[in-house]
Amino acid sequence: MLTRQSRLLRRIPPPNAVLQSGLQRRHRSTDRYSNNIHTSSTQNAPAPVYDAPIREKGMTIEAKERVRAHARKIQSSASTAAASPAVRPQPAQHFQAAPQPMPANTPRFESDGQVKNGLDYSFIGLSGGQIFQEMMLRHDVKQVFGYPGGAILPVFDAIYNSPHFDFVLPRHEQGAGHMAEGYARVSGKPGVVLVTSGPGATNVITPMQDALSDGVPMVVFCGQVATNLIGSDAFQEADVVGISRSCTKWNVMVKDIAELPRRINEAFKIATTGRPGPVLVDLPKDVTAAILRTPIPAKSAQPGHSPYLPSNPLNPSSQPSDPLPGDADLITEAAQMINKAKRPIIFAGNGVLSSPEGPKLLKELSDKGRIPVTTTLQGLGAFDERDEKSLHMIGMHGSAYANFAMQEADVLIALGVRFDDRVTGKVDTFAPAAKAAAAEGRGGIIHFEIQPKNINKIVEAQIPVLGDVVASLAELVPQIEAVDRSAWIGRCKATKERYPFTYTPSQEGQKLKPQEVVQELDRQAEALGKEKFIISTGVGQHQMWACQYYRWTEPRSWVSSGGLGTMGFGLPSAIGAKVAAPEKYVIDIDGDASFSMTAMELATASQYDIGVKVLLFNNEFQGMVEQWQDLFYENRYSHTRMTNPDFVKLSESMGTKGLRCTKLEDLPRMMKEFLEYDGKRPIVLECLVSSEHVYPMIPAGKALHEQLLHPLLRNGSE
């Protein structure tokens, strides 16, 4: 009877089979075994004996030695030991190749006269990087924000010393994204970002989500490893198409150089069509380094002419056309409801700012119908707040009088808004008078919106008008009748006087109040001309005080992160805004916590002579979080206190002028110096401010009329 060990040995395959299967499994040549494998045939090798019974432990070792000895005698032919095919194909021709010298001023390649039979021959002989530059020219791109890296070098080499557009190099890719947002919000043109693969691309995820939340057009081009390396966990490889799918309107990887012009056209069209937003184009290195050898369809190389672009439900034609208004019958029905209303209110959002005509039509609607206007945070500037019909911003930290008026209105005219939770408060209790009027057939909610998914998503509208908001307004305004609503306007005016924005002024020897700083800026900006000013902010209490105490009068003068609430947004977005409007005062009102997240971008502003002005509130706290901890967490300040650097010295170390204001009596003089400083150089004015709460405030889960008022107003609350 065989022992257990001998039975196991019977199951071992012949040694030559073991060796050959091992070689196949590893895809290796026989070089590593050349010291102990012969090159002659193995056919006559004697078969090993496995059947000898093993009764002692020592014999186990002896049996193993016999197997090893037999393995050393195995002979192998060259054909048997040949290496298996490589796991990957050879890299593309241009991958890892030394870049070819590019002329200092790459010429523009005109397609006129090079289109035959519907094919464009103008790109033949150009690299993917050169095609990228040409497409930027065709889309009239004047500014690019980005950061180089290995996978995107063919593109950076193609735009080397390009005279056709300017490039701003930030200190972090997130900064590039926010700069592109600021540029887009002020100019109305899509912001363009160019970064490398891996971390370069993932660092732009936050700006893309921010742009998606606030409807900002942005086109992000990122490098990628060569196509033959995709999926191999190569250096700086990341599935950025998968990662960015939920934070972009559309994304794509370009897999062949011939499709590059078409994909770029699609990106710009989708970013700017309908509700604007971010798109991403992933560019593998071998695609941007390759040379185009064949003509491409002419239409695919022309901006706005992409025959493969999915149809826009509002514009089925692939050709450019004017924005389409909503259904004419619904617009007429909306006009009839407005004309019959006794207490209508206009609720204007960012959609009104999508066209220069939007604010003009909004004013005409308000004046003609004698209708008060309130705005969202992103709608600031759409309506002149000096107008007596202005109710300023609505919502969690909006004006008390706007919140009260919203609850009393019998007709709500919502223009380009999403009904965000910061605006509605508890949805079930939002606009109760309008809902009651709808039930009685004498009023209700009218919602003008371009994005279908926003219709009836949060608040049910009695008249939903799907289409371009500004185009719909152009159809609506002529149908509005002049109605005497002096009683309603008078009630709104009385409420404004009863519940103004309020704070307790600072006393001698005390720190500045942040509200005082914003009011001084507003006073001096009014004297210089509000049309010359653009204000950006970070996220936090300072953002709300800027909304409340600066009087907004001009479209596209407000740049802030609303939907996502991105701390660190203020400074880089101000840089982008200043690039878009170099002739204007661009001021970043920021808090110490928010500013610290992207403070290194001061070095960018200094390097490129971008004259942004940072008005910095320093209270050494994460103020908004501290306020919630005060009100709802029994003053337990869990990790909200800041230890800050010397911001003046920090600014000076980056080539930026720094000022510090500690007393109210010095504020007017220092604000004047701050505003009059060289418009081509950045400056920081740090104001040491006290910790304050932002009022009014609507607690989570409460209705608009259940807002917390400033202590000075609470005795008179309704």
From Swiss-Prot:
Pfam families per record: TPP_enzyme_C, TPP_enzyme_M, TPP_enzyme_N
Protein name, UniProt field: Acetolactate synthase, mitochondrial
GO biological process: isoleucine biosynthetic process; L-valine biosynthetic process
Keywords: Amino-acid biosynthesis, Branched-chain amino acid biosynthesis, FAD, Flavoprotein, Magnesium, Metal-binding, Mitochondrion, Thiamine pyrophosphate, Transferase, Transit peptide
EC number(s) from the headed UniProt entry: 2.2.1.6
Superkingdom field: Eukaryota
GO molecular function, one term: thiamine pyrophosphate binding
Location of the region described as Disordered in the Swiss-Prot/TrEMBL record: 1-50, 72-101, 296-327
Pathway(s) served: Amino-acid biosynthesis; L-isoleucine biosynthesis; L-isoleucine from 2-oxobutanoate: step 1/4; Amino-acid biosynthesis; L-valine biosynthesis; L-valine from pyruvate: step 1/4
The species this protein was found in: Cryptococcus neoformans var. neoformans serotype D (strain JEC21 / ATCC MYA-565) (Filobasidiella neoformans)
